């Protein structure tokens, strides 16, 4: 709710934050199914896809990407834009930052991320970690909307953001990558100067896109 409030203040837009089913009780694809239901609800209410910006942080960043990919797979209109804060895009955990930033990130650990991905995939799943359904970094990203990606230099998931921005650019998706010095996972929720700067940047990005 902290980030939802900050998004509303920085963008001047209405913000809908929804609860979705969580792992391990509700593993993949429960979360994406719930997100699609919310998308369908917004469309049913007469809110056009081009009037919606989908935002998410951490696992929510993964969900935001997977929602856009699911909408694309259904042949439907994309949201106006994506705003991703420290998104989790690569469940293979092979990015360089998983080792280089292990001692720097005060929020996440390698073991914690491993336990989260195992819970999210589900005990009976046969999906590989590089499957785009789990790791949107490896998806066909063409046709996705303009995307703002924010990440801190000190976070384990830094590679997820850097590699996503690179993949999007290579696939002709407009992507803006912002890397904030000495910041950690989802630093935007904290009362620090870099968080204020990041939220101001989100506001500028949204107003430019709209």
Task: Describe the role of every protein-language-model region.
Residues 1-210:
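Alpha/beta-hydrolase superfamily serine-hydrolase fold, recognizing
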């Amino acid at each position: 709710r902290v980030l939802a409030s900050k998004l509303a203040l920085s963008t001047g837009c209405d913000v809908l934050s929804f609860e979705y089913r969580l792992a391990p009780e509700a593993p993949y694809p429960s979360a994406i199914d719930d997100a699609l239901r919310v998308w369908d609800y917004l469309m049913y209410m007469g809110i056009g896809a081009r009037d919606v910006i989908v935002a998410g942080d951490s696992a929510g960043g993964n969900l935001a990407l997977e929602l856009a990919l699911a909408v694309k797979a259904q042949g439907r209109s994309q949201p106006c834009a994506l705003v991703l804060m420290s998104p989790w895009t690569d469940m293979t955990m092979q990015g360089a930052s998983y080792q280089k930033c292990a001692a720097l990130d005060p929020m996440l650990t390698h073991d914690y991320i491993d336990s989260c991905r195992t819970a999210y995939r589900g005990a009976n799943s046969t999906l590989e970690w590089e499957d785009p359904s789990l790791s949107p970094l490896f998806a066909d990203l063409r046709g996705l909307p303009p995307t703002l990606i924010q990440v801190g230099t000190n976070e384990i998931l830094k590679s997820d953001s850097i590699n996503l921005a690179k993949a999007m650019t290579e696939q002709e998706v407009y992507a803006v990558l912002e890397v904030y010095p000495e910041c950690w996972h989802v630093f935007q929720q904290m009362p620090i100067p870099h968080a204020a700067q990041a939220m101001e940047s989100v506001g500028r990005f949204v107003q430019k896109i709209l």
